[in-house]
Structures are given as C-alpha cells and as structure tokens.
C-alpha cells in the first residue's frame, strides 16, 4: 500500500514538473542557476565576494555595476559642482565686498545688513531648507544653491581689503588722473587683493564638494540618474546591512583623497601668494 502511494506521488510530481516546463521553457535553466548560486545568503555573499576579489577592484553594487567606474564618474560630478559653485560664490562675494568696502556709508550698511541675515543662519540648515523648498533636483540647481548661499566669508574678507586699500596712495593717484570708480575698484585695487580671492576660491571648492555629498546623500542633490559620491553613499546604506561594504569604502576613500589634496593645495597657494610670508 505504501509503495503504491509513493509511486502515485512520484508520478504526480513528475507531471507537475513537466507542466512547469511546458508553461515556463526556461525552468531547467533557472533551476541550474539556482543550484550554482545557492539559495542561502552565505552562498550569494561568497559569489559576490569572489567577483569583488577576482574581477573588480572595488566590487559591484546590487545592480552589478562596477563600483570603481561609478566612483570615478561620481568624482566628475562632485568636482564639477564644487568648482562651479565656488566660482559663483567667489564672483558674488567679491563684487558685493568691493562695493561695500569701497563706497562705504549707506551702501556698506545695506550690504552688511544683507550679509548679517545670511551669516546668522547655519550654513547647512540654510542649504537644506532652500533645497527642500525648490524640490527640483539637478546639477545646475545644486550649483546655484551652494553658490548663492556660500559667499559670506568671501564678502567679509574682500570688504576688509577694500577698506584698507581705498585710502592708499596708488588709489589716490588713479583718482587724480581721472580713473572712474569701477576702474579704481577692479583695475587698480583688485589685483592687489587677488591672492585673498584665489585662496578663498580653493577653500570653497573643498567646502562645496562636501556640501554636495551631504545634499545627495540626504536626497536633495543630483537626480538618481546622475552618479555622485553622495548618491553612492545613499545606496550603500542598504548594502552595508547585508555586509557589502566596498561601495561605501570606495566613495569615502576617493572623497578623503580629493579633499586632502585640495586642502594641501590651498595651504601651498596661501603660502605662495601671501605677501607677509615673502
């Protein structure tokens, strides 16, 4: 009796398998793949680990994309945003600081009041608030947000330099020969304070690269179809829970190297251009 039941079960199982094969012609292929990859988490992790060590220096993400290629492409986005936003902030801060320091009086008071409003709000909170209000992701949006909010320190330094230089003899000589105010501001005074502006430009590149990473990590930065270090860190959160740490390591290592290199470059540039150290 028992043998007859076993035979009937075997026949029914075979009929089910044959039915599955008829409905899904790839059933045999999928079954073979499941046997190769394994059904447990340890087996899948071993396969990914083997690929990471044997084929890809930094492994692959959950979609199978090369992490090294992603981190290189992400560096392009972060550097582009950092440089573009630093240029916007430097131009804005230099122009406003030049007008405030050169003209003084009510112009200086109005621009200082404008500066006080921006500087009284913590920078990161201001950036996050503006990004949340705009609700429009994109590289240009991030550049404008960072550039239009990060000009305050440049304004303060440029204003102080113009207050100091506008009363010097070479500016008075330019006034005596009939040079206009704009010419005195940007042709005679600006070349003598350009070292301050260049150093601030380099410092703000580092600041804005880190700010872009923070924005993209929180979901307020570049869109999902644009690779950046911040979006890679965002993706690596779920992977880190499963033990896939290499995307997080790649993004952080590349960012640390770039920020350290720019910081060393800024220190060297300050030493080379500062007239007090010559």
Feature map (PLM): residue ranges:
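Membrane-topology segments of multi-pass transport proteins
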Residues: 1-63
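Alpha-helical transmembrane segments of integral membrane proteins
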Residues: 60-278
């Amino acid at each position: 009796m028992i043998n007859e039941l076993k035979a009937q079960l075997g026949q029914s199982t075979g009929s089910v398998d044959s039915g599955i094969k008829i409905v899904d012609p790839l059933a045999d292929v999928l079954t073979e793949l499941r046997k190769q990859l394994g059904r447990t988490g340890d087996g899948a992790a071993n396969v990914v680990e083997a690929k990471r060590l044997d084929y890809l220096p930094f492994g692959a993400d959950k979609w199978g994309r090369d992490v090294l290629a992603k981190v290189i492409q992400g560096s392009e986005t972060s550097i582009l945003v950092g440089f573009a936003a630093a240029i916007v902030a430097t131009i804005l801060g230099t122009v406003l600081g030049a007008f405030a320091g050169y003209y003084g009086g009510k112009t200086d008071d109005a621009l200082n009041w404008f500066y006080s409003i921006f500087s009284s709000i913590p920078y990161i909170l201001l950036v996050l608030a503006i990004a949340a209000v705009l609700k429009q992701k994109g590289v240009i949006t991030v550049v404008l947000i960072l550039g239009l909010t990060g000009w305050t320190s440049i304004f303060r330094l440029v204003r102080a330099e113009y207050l100091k230089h506008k009363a010097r003899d070479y500016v008075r000589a330019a006034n005596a020969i009939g040079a206009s105010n704009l010419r005195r501001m940007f042709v005679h005074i600006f070349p003598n304070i350009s070292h301050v502006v260049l150093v601030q430009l380099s410092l703000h590149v580092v600041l804005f690269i880190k700010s872009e990473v923070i924005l993209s990590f929180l979901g307020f930065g570049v869109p999902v179809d644009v690779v950046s270090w911040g979006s890679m860190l965002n993706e690596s959160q779920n992977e880190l829970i499963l033990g896939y740490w290499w995307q997080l390591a790649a993004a952080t290592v590349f960012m640390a190297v770039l920020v350290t290199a720019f910081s060393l470059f800024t220190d060297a540039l300050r030493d080379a251009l500062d007239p007090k150290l010559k």
